Every structure is written in structure tokens, then in C-alpha cells.
Amino acid sequence: LHIVHLNSMALGDIGVALEMVAAAQRQGLDITTEVYPYTAASTGLATTLFDPGWQERMGISYNDLQWVATGERLTEETFASYREEGGTVIIHLMKPEWIEQGVRSPVTMIGSDGMPYAPGAHPRSAGTFARVLGRFVREAGALTLTDALAKITPVRLAKASGSAQRSGSCRPVEVFRY
């Protein structure tokens, strides 16, 4: 079982969610999860996420939504118009401390879930891994370089599938300038 985007699913309950994943793993369950290193999420405005009650469920307002095509913050009127039109929004809804808690956790991997890149798109489309190395390793010291590389490469998945040990199997190689 893989739980996607634990940070944007759990929000302020990230600590509880991380402990639940850790407890399940300690009991031998094959469960993984990932976080992305941004305080904003991104999705299509026409999705069911924005059905009636979305403001109460997420604890945000129209102004916390940013229309990707123009960069503008939404109002009740522009929300209705753009929702009918269809398109992508950036959702400003997470606190930096929630993100750092998720990134630091030994039970998480780093995921980007980047959408096809377009001007104004969520930065995770191109900058997720550089952000982890720059902000959480170099600047904040929240992770060691070794731990960060383990979180951003498919090493965990290769170990789980056994491909890291099989002769002739592909192995990830990351080359970068730090």
C-alpha cells in the first residue's frame, strides 16, 4: 500500500499520520508514503475536491487558490467562472513546519507528482529534488545528504522488489554538483 502526498492529505495531523505509518511498518505491513517539499498543492479546479464544503474541509478560502494561467488569487466570482472553464489551481494550505516534519521522517520518501510543465505551474513540476537538497540539506540541516539521496532515489523501491540485488538489474545513478 502506498499513501500519496501524506503532507497534503494529513495537513495539521501530519505527526499522527506519520506515527500511524510507522506503527503499521513495525507490525510488518508493506506500506510506503511520500511527501513533497512545498506548502502548496496543485490540482484541477473541476475536480470533486472543490465540491460544496471544500472550504470547511480544507480550512481555506477562495483567496488561498491561485489560478495557474494568470497567477491571480481567486474570488468567489472567478472561482465559479474558472471551475466551469476547467484548469489548474495552486492551493496554498500547508504550514512550513508540517512540511519539515514530513521531510524529516524516516518513513517518507520524497515525491514530486509534477504535472506537465507550463509557465506558472506548481514549482514541484521541476524543482522538488533541488529544493530538498538546497533547503532541507544545505540550508536547514534537516536531513543529511545521504538521507536525502535515499529519499529522492528509487533505492527503497529497488530494495523492496529485489532488483537492487539481482545481477544485471538496473540501478539508479544520481550525478549532481552539490
How does the language model describe each region?
Residues 129, 152-153:
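N-terminal alpha-helical segment
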Residues 106, 155-156:
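Alpha-helix boundary/capping residues
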Residues 39, 117, 151, 166-167:
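Residue-level signal for alpha-helical context at structural boundaries
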Residues 90-93, 99, 140-150, 157-178:
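Acidic, glycine-enriched loop/beta-strand segments at the rims
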Residues 2-142:
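Active-site neighborhoods of metal-dependent hydrolases
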